[in-house]
């Protein structure tokens, strides 16, 4: 007699989190995990930011009740997320055309956005960059959309294939949903410049496409305001859009699932109707978000002293990543790599697309205990003064 679940097949491991499981099972000393997108300090620890610590102490001392939040989350949290994205002087916010819902991390924001879009655009398709974050395709396919790609990375130049990207967008049918990495592209670290973003926004508007901007690393590229430039360019061109954002990395609150989904609507009335439907999506997924992480983020975003401290800590993290990029490029060269890895310095954010093949990545793991994603992506934020020499020598060895 077969059981209810007898026919259930074993699902493949997640390409990133599954790698983490392999790393944890590895008993070798000196192993290095460059797979998962987490920022570590120079001692190899996930930092607890001072601004977050102060907010948490205040939260504990207040002994506030932990009742249910509104479906859309904490008002101050949502207002803070909007301001970070669009600016304190945003005319769209002033006009009531912007709505935000607290979400379970950036992934949760993408999911509720995808579910909502499936309701209003059931016959649309989704375009993601080639390559993109591994979960983008699975997430939108799970929501019921066919997913295709647009050209993005040029392996020959280690840069952006902007002509190919524009051509794909210009050929896309109206109402195609286009997922765009607003800054610190994952996995390549290759971003568009201001002029290129303006061209993309013009094409998106002219072709009546639906931009879904994903910004999980605001502050890790050039700065909080600089990294929001793409969002603000679309806003300046009055483009209706969706934006998924995350504070997991920038606040070092990975386990608290602190994200937000922000939408720019055509009018205040439209924004209200959209929010009502978004709340229905949330209610049938998880009812409402948790209080703790959102309260900490809201406190920091809305307390000038804590905000200034957080911005300084974020700048320190950004500077350390830049230092690791420079040192890695120099040390790989010094170790005798056959190719120039100087392109790593030009990339932005937590990740680098090394150009290593899947076979070379396997060799890194099997022979050197260095774990990276099969695409060749490494998390530069996981490098430190204690492991960078080992990593550089291993990369040079497999790249010869």
Language-model features: locations:
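Short Gly/Ser/Thr- and Asp/Glu-enriched loop/turn motifs at secondary-structure junctions
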Residues: 95-97, 344-349, 373-378
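Active-site PLP attachment segment
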Residues: 230-273, 277
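Conserved core of the PLP fold type I
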Residues: 57-205, 219-220, 229-231, 356-357, ...
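Conserved PLP-binding catalytic core of the aspartate aminotransferase-like
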Residues: 311-367
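Structural signature of PLP-dependent enzymes
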Residues: 275-294, 300-329
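Hydrophobic beta-strand scaffold residues
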Residues: 34, 147, 211, 241, ...
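N-terminal "arm"/small-domain region of PLP-dependent enzymes with the aminotransferase-like
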Residues: 2-73, 80-83, 87, 284, ...
């Amino acid at each position: 007699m077969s059981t209810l679940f007898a026919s259930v097949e074993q699902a493949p491991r997640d390409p990133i989190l599954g790698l983490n499981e392999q790393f944890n099972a590895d008993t070798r000393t000196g192993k290095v995990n460059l797979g998962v997108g987490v920022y570590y300090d120079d001692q190899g620890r996930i930092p607890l930011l001072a601004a977050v610590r102060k907010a948490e102490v205040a939260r504990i001392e207040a002994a506030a009740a932990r009742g249910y939040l509104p479906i859309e989350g904490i008002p101050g949290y949502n207002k803070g997320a909007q301001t970070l994205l669009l600016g304190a002087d945003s005319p769209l916010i002033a006009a009531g055309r912007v709505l935000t819902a607290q979400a379970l991390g950036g992934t949760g924001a993408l999911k509720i956005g995808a579910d909502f879009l499936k309701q209003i655009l059931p016959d649309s398709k989704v375009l993601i960059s080639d390559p993109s974050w591994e979960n983008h395709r699975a997430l939108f396919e799970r929501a019921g959309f066919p997913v295709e790609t647009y050209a993005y990375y040029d392996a020959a130049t280690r840069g952006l294939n902007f002509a190919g990207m524009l051509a794909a967008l210009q050929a896309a049918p109206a109402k195609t949903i286009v997922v765009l990495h607003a800054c610190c592209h994952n996995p390549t670290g290759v971003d568009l410049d201001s002029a290129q973003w303006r061209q993309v926004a013009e094409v998106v508007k002219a072709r009546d496409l639906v931009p879904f901007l994903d910004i999980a690393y605001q502050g890790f590229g050039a700065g909080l305001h600089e990294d929001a430039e793409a969002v603000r360019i679309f806003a300046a061109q009055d483009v209706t859009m969706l934006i998924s954002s995350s504070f997991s990395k920038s606040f070092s609150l990975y386990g608290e699932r602190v994200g937000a989904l922000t939408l720019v609507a055509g009018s205040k009335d439209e924004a209200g109707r959209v929010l009502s439907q978004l709340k229905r999506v949330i209610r049938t997924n998880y009812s409402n978000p948790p209080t703790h992480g959102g309260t900490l983020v809201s406190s920091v975003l809305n307390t000038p002293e804590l905000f200034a401290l957080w911005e300084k800590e974020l700048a320190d993290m950004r500077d350390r990543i830049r230092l690791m990029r420079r040192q890695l490029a120099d040390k790989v060269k010094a170790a005798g790599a056959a190719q120039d890895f100087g392109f790593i310095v030009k990339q932005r954010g937590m990740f680098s697309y090394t150009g290593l093949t899947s076979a070379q990545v396997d060799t890194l793991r099997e022979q050197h205990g260095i774990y990276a994603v099969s695409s060749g992506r490494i998390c530069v934020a996981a490098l430190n003064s204690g492991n960078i020499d080992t990593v550089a020598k291993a990369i040079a060895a497999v790249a010869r």
